[in-house]
Amino acid sequence: MSGGSSGTQQREREILLVAHPGRAEITETARRVGKIFERAGIGLRVLVDEVDSTRIEPMDGMAADEFLVPGLEVTIVQAGPDAALGCEMVLVLGGDGTFLRAAELAQAASIPVLGINLGRIGFLAETEAEHLDEALAQVVRREYRIEHRMTLDVLVRVDDEIIERGWALNEASIENRSRLGVLEVVLEVDGRPVSAFGCDGVLISTPTGSTAYAFSAGGPVVWPELEALLVVPSNAHALFARPLVTSPNSLIAVETVAGSHDGLVFCDGRRTLELPAGARVEVVRGKEPVRWIRLDSAPFADRMVRKFELPVTGWRGRKP
């Protein structure tokens, strides 16, 4: 069947494509991906910009008519928890925002995700657009490995009653709902109080998220091979409100002081949890990781230098 159809016969291998919408070069790249997989006998599902409100937040996918190519067989699917079921992987064309949207679908189906950066920094992507053909050839030959990245499980309690649940790959950002005044919180680690302070918010991050919002807030960069939890206060009014790195098995709790402002918890900037004044946020290592496709063994330091364009002129160390 031609592009835009939803009745394509199931193939032995099938891949879900999630692409950033609205840019002609990405649409053209997506069609190129479809043709390569078609020649390799790999089925392609294409996410369209519909929403399944039962699980997945609104997700900008390609419009169905953007992918119409005569002779190219694709299956059009809507965003939802079942969008990637039965697929070998989720392939992402775009930047970090598109990757985080795709990670929701990949995690729901317990399959890996591969990012091709067509955005700006694209820290979460495995490779760049100029290496697309080589990356797809490795996928066709199954020449990739899967790396598990830790996630966060997040819940909100009011008087011991759980009122909200969520998860994050990068970070859970606890923020003041009001832009007036500060959010008064008490930080707890492993059942013990650590510090109380007024702040704009508190970030709890994974190593993967240490190069994202937590980095902008002054947190350390943590190598992804290291499992840990990061706690980064944002604009805290306190002598001791430094970033903390805890055990991956720690329970991090942030209690909002009764009578303070209401807050919100943003999970990866995509999923929002309500945080009434006097409520408690608890964050632990997630039960379900995000499975990450790796195509090479390049050191994380090289990726960091390249993505952040760090100056290394004058280095005289040993070349690999």
Curated annotation (Swiss-Prot):
<comment type="function">
    <text>Involved in the regulation of the intracellular balance of NAD and NADP, and is a key enzyme in the biosynthesis of NADP. Catalyzes specifically the phosphorylation on 2'-hydroxyl of the adenosine moiety of NAD to yield NADP.</text>
</comment>
<keyword id="KW-0808">Transferase</keyword>
<keyword id="KW-0521">NADP</keyword>
<protein>
    <recommendedName>
        <fullName>NAD kinase</fullName>
        <ecNumber>2.7.1.23</ecNumber>
    </recommendedName>
</protein>
<dbReference type="GO" id="GO:0005737">
    <property type="term" value="C:cytoplasm"/>
</dbReference>
<dbReference type="InterPro" id="IPR002504">
    <property type="entry name" value="NADK"/>
</dbReference>
<dbReference type="GO" id="GO:0003951">
    <property type="term" value="F:NAD+ kinase activity"/>
</dbReference>
<dbReference type="GO" id="GO:0006741">
    <property type="term" value="P:NADP biosynthetic process"/>
</dbReference>
<feature type="binding site">
    <location>
        <position position="200"/>
    </location>
    <ligand>
        <name>NAD(+)</name>
    </ligand>
</feature>
<keyword id="KW-0418">Kinase</keyword>
<feature type="binding site">
    <location>
        <begin position="170"/>
        <end position="171"/>
    </location>
    <ligand>
        <name>NAD(+)</name>
    </ligand>
</feature>
<feature type="binding site">
    <location>
        <begin position="211"/>
        <end position="216"/>
    </location>
    <ligand>
        <name>NAD(+)</name>
    </ligand>
</feature>
<dbReference type="InterPro" id="IPR016064">
    <property type="entry name" value="NAD/diacylglycerol_kinase_sf"/>
</dbReference>
<keyword id="KW-0547">Nucleotide-binding</keyword>
<dbReference type="InterPro" id="IPR017438">
    <property type="entry name" value="ATP-NAD_kinase_N"/>
</dbReference>
<keyword id="KW-0520">NAD</keyword>
<comment type="similarity">
    <text>Belongs to the NAD kinase family.</text>
</comment>
<dbReference type="Pfam" id="PF01513">
    <property type="entry name" value="NAD_kinase"/>
</dbReference>
<feature type="binding site">
    <location>
        <position position="101"/>
    </location>
    <ligand>
        <name>NAD(+)</name>
    </ligand>
</feature>
<dbReference type="InterPro" id="IPR017437">
    <property type="entry name" value="ATP-NAD_kinase_PpnK-typ_C"/>
</dbReference>
<keyword id="KW-0067">ATP-binding</keyword>
<dbReference type="GO" id="GO:0019674">
    <property type="term" value="P:NAD metabolic process"/>
</dbReference>
<dbReference type="GO" id="GO:0051287">
    <property type="term" value="F:NAD binding"/>
</dbReference>
<keyword id="KW-0963">Cytoplasm</keyword>
<dbReference type="GO" id="GO:0005524">
    <property type="term" value="F:ATP binding"/>
</dbReference>
<feature type="active site" description="Proton acceptor">
    <location>
        <position position="96"/>
    </location>
</feature>
<feature type="binding site">
    <location>
        <begin position="96"/>
        <end position="97"/>
    </location>
    <ligand>
        <name>NAD(+)</name>
    </ligand>
</feature>
<dbReference type="Pfam" id="PF20143">
    <property type="entry name" value="NAD_kinase_C"/>
</dbReference>
<dbReference type="GO" id="GO:0046872">
    <property type="term" value="F:metal ion binding"/>
</dbReference>
